[in-house]
């Protein structure tokens, strides 16, 4: 049977991205474990997890979704209650929608991800951004949060309904003083969300220890899961609001539209969970931070400056410099991407030469050394 010509570009599509070394901050924490790859095939059908479902996703005993959501996950993220969502942005919106009314204010850091702002806009909130310090640090300080909250009070006559802290931010990998900021928010009577999309699943993280009332995490970004999938954490004080059930469909939680991640998404998260727990132990994370700092030093030795926290405390880093940009002016703007692709190194976006961000999570010192040797060889090739 001949196939419609317009359909031939669909069907199975092979990925041609080089993946011997992956430095893409969006991808390093979401690389599937071998167990998750098996789960992807076993549970890939849309409603596969619903073979023995009684009407509530989080109550499914076979597979052990109930134990994961109600026992393992709250302990792992350090919160009283947890839910699996369709991503960190969905977690943030669910919290905002449950906790606020249209026209309320939310204060969030100036390094916040765009999805935090869009989630607030979807909830019909006014957004006050906390200024970051100037280059090269781009820090978020408790004092700046206090000033922003005071400005909202003066403008609206009351404190903001919510605050949000990005921990770490997705541009520079900065880890703000979360405990000081959450304490300050609470002094003003403001509950606070910690967006841990680049923390939960990558590094040690306990929301209550940081003073969070709510947390949002990303499975496909940081928990070795197939997306879209995320996590939401809430403490007992606000659980009734965020986890409220429908008055007409009494086993369905309103903010999650009943059920969220099904099939491959939640099952790959569960399959990777033992490995994720292991890699977030302090001793494992210390090695990751050591590798990131080593790589930062090596990059600075060739003329690229690392921005943000120094010494750095996260795998995500932002670099800027002219060494590759100057070469691009003599060749073309895509030369760096092309040269790295030939060595099967992925992660720096095509066309970026003057500034770019990358992640060293899980790459290891040997492969990071290979990346540095490759970058040095590229410089010699064009400037030698």
UniProtKB/Swiss-Prot annotation:
<dbReference type="Pfam" id="PF05889">
    <property type="entry name" value="SepSecS"/>
</dbReference>
<comment type="function">
    <text>Converts O-phospho-L-seryl-tRNA(Cys) (Sep-tRNA(Cys)) to L-cysteinyl-tRNA(Cys) (Cys-tRNA(Cys)).</text>
</comment>
<dbReference type="InterPro" id="IPR008829">
    <property type="entry name" value="SepSecS/SepCysS"/>
</dbReference>
<comment type="subunit">
    <text>Homodimer. Interacts with SepRS.</text>
</comment>
<feature type="modified residue" description="N6-(pyridoxal phosphate)lysine">
    <location>
        <position position="221"/>
    </location>
</feature>
<feature type="binding site">
    <location>
        <position position="195"/>
    </location>
    <ligand>
        <name>pyridoxal 5'-phosphate</name>
    </ligand>
</feature>
<feature type="binding site">
    <location>
        <begin position="88"/>
        <end position="89"/>
    </location>
    <ligand>
        <name>pyridoxal 5'-phosphate</name>
    </ligand>
</feature>
<dbReference type="InterPro" id="IPR015422">
    <property type="entry name" value="PyrdxlP-dep_Trfase_small"/>
</dbReference>
<protein>
    <recommendedName>
        <fullName>O-phospho-L-seryl-tRNA:Cys-tRNA synthase 1</fullName>
        <ecNumber>2.5.1.73</ecNumber>
    </recommendedName>
</protein>
<dbReference type="GO" id="GO:0006412">
    <property type="term" value="P:translation"/>
</dbReference>
<keyword id="KW-0648">Protein biosynthesis</keyword>
<dbReference type="InterPro" id="IPR015421">
    <property type="entry name" value="PyrdxlP-dep_Trfase_major"/>
</dbReference>
<dbReference type="InterPro" id="IPR015424">
    <property type="entry name" value="PyrdxlP-dep_Trfase"/>
</dbReference>
<feature type="binding site">
    <location>
        <begin position="218"/>
        <end position="220"/>
    </location>
    <ligand>
        <name>pyridoxal 5'-phosphate</name>
    </ligand>
</feature>
<keyword id="KW-0808">Transferase</keyword>
<dbReference type="GO" id="GO:0043766">
    <property type="term" value="F:Sep-tRNA:Cys-tRNA synthase activity"/>
</dbReference>
<keyword id="KW-0663">Pyridoxal phosphate</keyword>
<comment type="similarity">
    <text>Belongs to the SepCysS family.</text>
</comment>
<dbReference type="InterPro" id="IPR013375">
    <property type="entry name" value="Sep_Cys-tRNA_synth_arc"/>
</dbReference>
